[in-house]
């Protein structure tokens, strides 16, 4: 991820490198603290309330680091923090600690859920007011997932499906951005240069990567808007190919599987819920943004953990890694009893299923649809390549040159020597694409 950011946006690469150093320092410091997991559990209300207050502050002193845009960051002395990123982590900490402490209620639903609904509802209200809809969706998903893991009751997941569907319908009625993203997702080819521009360019980048990619630094992922952040998966797919895409998906799957393994062997319910919730957090967010890049899901605008540009996201992801390592370290302790393992198995199967679908989607664009996408008139990659690598000559049977390259590498253009045969030879134009023999003989 860092290499791709440096390659696309060097100034952001420098910032991300500094954030990586800070995140590594926080990680090392956390390993030396006496018992950070106990501190997180003991002050669960304080942590979540602090996160809510920081998020609320963005309504008054929020900024957008790149100039004009959604003011979701808090800034000071050139350092910017997006509070909604650690807020997701703090929600998982709060729910895990609260549910572990409230087991004695034996799931009297009114008594159990009231505090969680108040705090989670407050967080959702803030995120919706900010139009940070991708984070709001993750919040809602994590809330029901952790509740399902703690209760083991299928009705929780049934309620989750109903709530998410209702939220999607209501959101599409209230928020124009959701309507636009849904339309772009369902039929991107209707407006490929307008509202669907991002997703169309993203899948073109994946298609351009084919099986092995163009090579580091040799593709054109910069054609995809915000390729260093929201669409970094497409950028990696173009230069590393389907092989790199599958490798990245495999790493996400390995991370989630190791996190769930730590959850199953955790010595307490609190640590079990925490490990499973944080693993689900990384998995769900990765699936959402990769799915958006591949048109498997509507765009959400969240980051790809550990990969996309974003200091707040990187720092939060390193803290998640720290917590998972702390939970998995004490191997000498006996795992806490697990009367209902089915929810954890279903969570693992769901993650595997989703990642498999994404792998098939990447293969579909990179292999099956690569040829037609590469020759589309709105795909500028062929035109860029033709400027640097000559297309060669078209000759008749007598050896007469009909069409040839003129110019030098970087400024090659096609010249037709026999205009009367242009209907046959066709054209290779940066705006209108390929036709005639230029299209039929395209390498």
Regions found by a protein language model. Name each.
Residues 2-131, 290-305, 309, 313-318, ...:
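Membrane-helix boundary/helix-loop-helix interface segments in multi-pass membrane proteins
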Residues 21-23, 238-257:
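Hydrophobic alpha-helical transmembrane segments
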Residues 25, 110-128, 133-173:
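Hydrophobic alpha-helical segments of polytopic membrane proteins
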Residues 39-44, 109-114, 151-162, 337-349:
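Membrane-interfacial entry segments at the cytosolic side of transmembrane helices
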Residues 54, 58, 93-97, 123, ...:
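Alpha-helical transmembrane segments of multi-pass membrane proteins
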Residues 65-73, 77-80, 156-248, 266-274:
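Hydrophobic, glycine- and aromatic-enriched re-entrant/interface helices and adjoining loop segments
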Residues 262-301, 307:
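Loop-to-helix entry and N-terminal half of a specific, functionally important transmembrane alpha helix
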Residues 328-443:
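Periplasmic/cell-envelope proteins involved in peptidoglycan metabolism and beta-lactam response
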């Amino acid at each position: 991820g860092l290499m791709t950011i440096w390659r696309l946006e060097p100034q952001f690469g420098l910032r991300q490198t500094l954030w990586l150093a800070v995140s590594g320092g926080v990680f090392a410091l956390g390993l030396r603290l006496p018992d950070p997991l106990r501190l997180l559990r003991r002050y669960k209300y304080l942590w979540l309330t602090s996160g809510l207050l920081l998020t609320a502050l963005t309504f008054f002193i929020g900024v957008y680091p790149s100039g004009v845009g959604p003011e979701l960051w808090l800034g000071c002395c050139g350092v910017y923090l997006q509070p909604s990123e650690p807020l997701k982590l703090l929600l998982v900490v709060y729910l895990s600690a609260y549910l572990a402490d409230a087991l004695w209620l034996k799931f009297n639903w009114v008594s159990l859920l009231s505090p969680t609904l108040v705090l989670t509802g407050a967080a959702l209200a803030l995120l919706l007011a900010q139009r940070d809809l991708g984070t709001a969706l993750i919040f809602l998903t994590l809330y029901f997932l952790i509740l399902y893991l703690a209760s083991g009751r299928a009705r929780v997941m049934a309620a989750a499906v109903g709530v998410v569907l209702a939220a999607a319908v209501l959101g599409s009625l209230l928020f124009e951005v959701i309507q636009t993203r849904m339309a772009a997702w369902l039929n991107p080819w209707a407006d490929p240069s307008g509202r669907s521009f991002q997703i169309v360019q993203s899948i073109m980048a994946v298609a351009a990567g084919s099986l092995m990619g163009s090579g580091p630094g040799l593709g054109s992922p910069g054609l995809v808007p915000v390729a260093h952040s929201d669409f970094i998966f497409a950028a990696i797919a173009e230069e590393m190919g389907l092989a790199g895409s599958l490798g990245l998906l495999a790493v996400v799957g390995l991370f989630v599987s190791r996190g769930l393994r730590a959850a199953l062997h955790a010595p307490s319910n609190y640590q079990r819920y925490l490990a499973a919730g944080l693993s689900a957090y990384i998995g769900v967010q990765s699936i959402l943004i990769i799915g958006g890049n591949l048109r498997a899901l509507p765009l959400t605008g969240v980051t790809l953990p550990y990969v996309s540009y974003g200091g707040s996201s990187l720092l939060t992801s390193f803290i998640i890694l720290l917590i998972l390592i702390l939970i998995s370290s004490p191997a000498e302790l006996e795992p806490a009893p697990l009367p209902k393992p089915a929810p954890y198995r279903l969570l693992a199967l769901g993650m595997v299923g989703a990642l498999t679908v994404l792998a098939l989607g990447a293969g579909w664009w990179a292999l099956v649809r690569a040829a037609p996408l590469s020759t589309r008139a709105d795909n500028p990659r062929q035109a860029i390549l033709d400027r640097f690598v000559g297309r060669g000559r078209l000759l008749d049977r007598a050896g007469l040159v009909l069409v040839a390259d003129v110019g030098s590498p970087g400024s090659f253009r096609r010249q037709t020597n026999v205009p009367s045969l242009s209907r046959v030879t066709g054209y290779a134009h940066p705006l209108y694409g390929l036709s005639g023999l230029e299209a039929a003989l395209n390498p």
